[in-house]
């Protein structure tokens, strides 16, 4: 299983609320139709009052994680009309000059999210 990770920044002129609402409720359903996509997660930035550890250089507003079986499935998905529709829609809420992405393989070192007996 591989994961495509997008670090995104909202388009200028959008409030946080407008950005997160559009991303989740309009763009999100578009993304769920991408063929071969096994899992889709959005992580929306939360402000932390007094946080001095946020870098001043690049500030992202969120992260999208798209899981595929393998790189071949990702490459096939990128050729699909659904991917093209999703990419075109990004212009409505993302500043493409402030985006970073990479393909990764997850290595879980700790998972205490499951209830313990």
Predicted feature residues:
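Macromolecular interaction modules
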Residues: 1-117
């Amino acid at each position: 299983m591989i994961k495509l990770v997008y670090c995104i920044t909202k388009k200028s002129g959008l409030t946080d609320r407008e950005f997160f609402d559009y991303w989740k409720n309009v763009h999100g359903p578009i993304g769920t139709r991408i063929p071969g996509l096994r899992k889709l997660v959005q992580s929306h930035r939360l402000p932390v009052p007094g946080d001095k550890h946020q870098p001043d250089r690049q500030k992202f507003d969120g992260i999208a994680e798209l899981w595929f079986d393998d790189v071949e499935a990702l490459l096939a998905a990128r050729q699909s009309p659904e991917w093209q529709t999703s990419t075109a829609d990004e212009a409505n809420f993302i500043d493409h000059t402030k985006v970073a992405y990479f393909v990764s393989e997850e290595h879980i070192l700790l998972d205490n999210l499951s209830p313990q007996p």
